[in-house]
Design a protein with these regions (language model features):
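Glycine-rich, proline-tolerant flexible connector loops at the mouths of alpha/beta enzymes
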Residues: 84-98
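Active-site mouth loops of central-metabolism enzymes
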Residues: 50-64, 141-143
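Catalytic domains of carbohydrate-active enzymes, especially glycoside hydrolases
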Residues: 60, 64-85, 290, 294
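Active-site region of glycoside hydrolase catalytic domains
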Residues: 1-49, 73, 92-94, 103-463
Length: 463
């Protein structure tokens, strides 16, 4: 089979709050993720001394990263997506001087990656922000958080300008509509007007970070990151088709702002029709004109949309409130598996924005069984990924420009949605259970060797 383009980036993606642990070490402050010990849809819990959560240790990447990076290198990674924990750098979020211990940790991590020939792709904010900014200012509901984020971004750009040339601003920025506390630091009960105002502040902050990156690291590239939720009409009824258009716009509008530099007309109408008034200043409009260099996104599933509200209420099942597609199988967690949908989405994004695309999350969460000899035969994961990578290559043949692919969770980690480790994505098994038991020992699954061979052939061995 045909190989992927020369220079294609292969690797995996992790997030600080799902792997690092060490949640109170070396001056780190509490984040919104720390206050959501049961996941992004769980209740908010202000932590007390002596309590514990799975993410407090996670997989202890903070102390074990040399071992993990060596395993990534053994698979042939030439790229690793990570996130910086904002609260390691500014524990409360509004300090003027950064925490040197936090900066030093990422210095060491980037040096370790460089020693193995692995390019870092760094997310500035991945499903967390300083809890101090939530308590003091109301999270992204306040313009003060824009200032704090820009200061944080400029600090890390300056510190790592010789070590990191690929950046992302906010992880799955459109998830704020579904999980406001995780996305913008607002209570999940917040009104649409409050959430969209906070999202506006975040979009402005993202654009200011892009501008700062271009100023401080002229040879760097910086992108956005979307949750790619492909939706099909449940039927060919015109009402279902139009409702699907509207639902796809609900996430694509973030990309429209970040790629085109202004709010699209359909979103301004949505605000008018729903009585939502967003404070947008002339300075905001000027800031938004700075657009991203590339588009990154996650892709796990697709679903269907219907204009029939009663049917929608009866059938919808996953985090994007889509209804199941009767033509697709589902994972153990109810996420519908649709490899061809990835090709469709890649083409849609390329046609819409004409910017290079980077798949920075994709994978199968499943319960893995450890055999008596310690082996793990995760053929289901291999099949899932093989089918998606084949469709990705078809999209490239369609003319889509792609930078790379980083699978989600190349090593088992604590899931974002429900803060459980039993939902495993990794090629590398971590001996830890949802109750916190286990040795944290690492071992290679069957998929480890499969992905190693895919990377070694630059995708030519896919079948």
């Amino acid at each position: 089979m045909k190989a992927f383009p020369a220079g294609f980036l292969w690797g995996g993606a992790i997030a600080a709050n799902q792997v690092e642990g060490a949640w109170q070490e070396d001056g780190k402050g509490p984040s919104t993720s720390d206050m959501q010990p049961n996941g992004v849809f769980g209740e908010l819990v202000e932590r007390k001394e002596g309590d514990s959560a799975l993410k407090d240790v996670a997989i202890d990447f903070y102390h074990r990263y040399p071992e993990d990076v060596a395993l990534f290198a053994e698979m042939g990674f030439n790229c690793l997506r990570i996130s910086i924990a904002w609260t390691r750098i500014f524990p409360n979020g509004d300090e003027s001087t950064p925490n040197e211990a936090g900066l030093a940790f990422y210095d060491d991590l980037f040096d370790e990656l460089a020693g193995h020939g692995i390019t870092p792709l760094v997310t500035l904010s991945h499903y967390e922000m300083p809890w101090g900014l939530v308590k003091e200012y109301g999270g992204w509901g306040s313009r003060e958080t824009i200032r704090c984020f820009e200061h944080y971004a400029r600090t890390v750009f300056s510190r790592y300008q010789n070590k990191v040339k690929l950046w992302l601003t906010f992880n799955e920025i459109n998830m704020s509509l579904h999980a406001p506390m995780t996305g913008v630091g607002l209570p999940n009960s917040s009104s649409k007007a409050e959430v969209y105002q906070a999202i506006h502040h975040q979009l402005v902050a993202s654009a200011l970070a892009v501008k700062a990156c271009h100023e401080i690291i002229p040879d760097a590239k910086i992108g956005n990151m979307l949750l790619g939720g492909l939706m099909y009409p449940l039927s060919c009824k015109p009402e279902d088709v139009f409702e699907t258009l509207q639902q796809n716009r609900s996430w694509a509008f973030f990309g429209d702002v970040q790629c085109r530099g202004a709010y699209p007309g359909y979103m301004l109408r949505y605000f008018r029709d729903n009585g939502i008034e967003i404070e947008i200043t002339d300075a905001d409009r000027e800031a938004l004109r700075t657009t991203v260099d590339f588009i990154s996104f996650s892709y796990y599933m697709s679903g269907c949309v219907t204009a029939d509200e009663a049917l929608n209420e009866q059938l919808r099942g996953n985090i994007l409130s889509m209804v199941p597609n009767p033509h697709l199988p589902s994972s153990e967690w109810g996420w519908q598996i649709d490899p061809l949908g990835l090709r469709t989405l890649l083409n849609m994004m390329w046609d819409r924005w004409q910017k290079p695309l980077f798949i920075v999350e994709n994978g199968l969460g499943a319960k893995d069984h450890v055999e008596a000899d310690g082996s793990i035969h995760d053929d289901y994961r291999i099949a899932y990924m093989n089918d998606h990578l084949l469709q990705m290559r078809e999209a490239i043949e369609d003319g889509v420009e792609m930078l790379g692919y980083t699978s989600w969770g190349p090593i088992d980690l604590v899931s974002a949605s429900k803060a459980e480790i039993s939902k495993r994505y990794g090629f590398i098994y971590v001996d830890r259970e949802d109750d916190g038991s286990g040795t944290l020992a690492r071992s290679r699954k069957k998929s480890f060797f499969w992905y190693r061979d895919v990377i070694a052939s630059n995708g030519a061995n896919l079948e």
